[in-house]
From Swiss-Prot:
InterPro entries according to UniProt: UPF0179 (IPR005369)
Protein name, entry field: UPF0179 protein Mpal_0949
Domain of life: Archaea
Pfam families registered for this protein in UniProt: UPF0179
Protein family according to the UniProt entry: Belongs to the UPF0179 family.
Length: 148
């Protein structure tokens, strides 16, 4: 398996700590006039990231209290449920996010934070059976997904 490449971005200095996981939500209107906005907004909207390390560089920021801090990040794996027949380690899948039964106990794992509709992921590990049953009666497996 290929090693995950890290990249440098800027996040709020008060948030910056190793291990922090976050979902990038996109650029804010307040960022339009910022001279370092490209460094802050160099991530993919909806993706989940994890901070590996913090750099000493801090920039003034109209969005974040105490400025924006340079951090090294990687895309973070997501844990979710997929159809059992797709749960094969190292396979590439397109997660099915079509279920609308939000009252189902499995719904949050069928729609994990950081999984973007229409994008492909690699099943990095099959973790086991679904912790709860599916209201639609589907056979599901709990897996770890990595963006590709």
């Amino acid at each position: 398996m290929a090693e995950i490449k890290s990249k440098v971005t800027l996040i709020g200095a008060m948030l910056a700590r190793p291990g922090l996981e976050f979902i990038y939500e996109g650029e804010l209107p307040a960022c339009e006039q910022c001279k370092v906005r490209k460094a802050c907004n160099n991530l993919k909207v909806g993706r989940k990231y994890r901070v590996l390390s913090i750099r000493a560089t801090v920039h003034g920021c109209s969005v974040h209290l105490n400025g924006a801090c340079a951090v090294e990040i990687v895309e973070s794996p997501m844990v979710g449920l997929i159809k059992a027949d797709l749960a094969i380690a190292n396979s590439r899948i397109l997660p099915d996010l079509s279920c609308t039964q939000s009252e189902c106990k499995s719904y949050p794992l069928c729609h994990p934070d950081g999984v973007v509709s229409g994008e492909r992921y690699m099943v990095s590990e099959v973790l086991g059976n679904a912790p709860d049953h599916c209201d639609k009666g589907r056979s599901l497996k709990l897996v770890e997904l990595l963006p590709i």
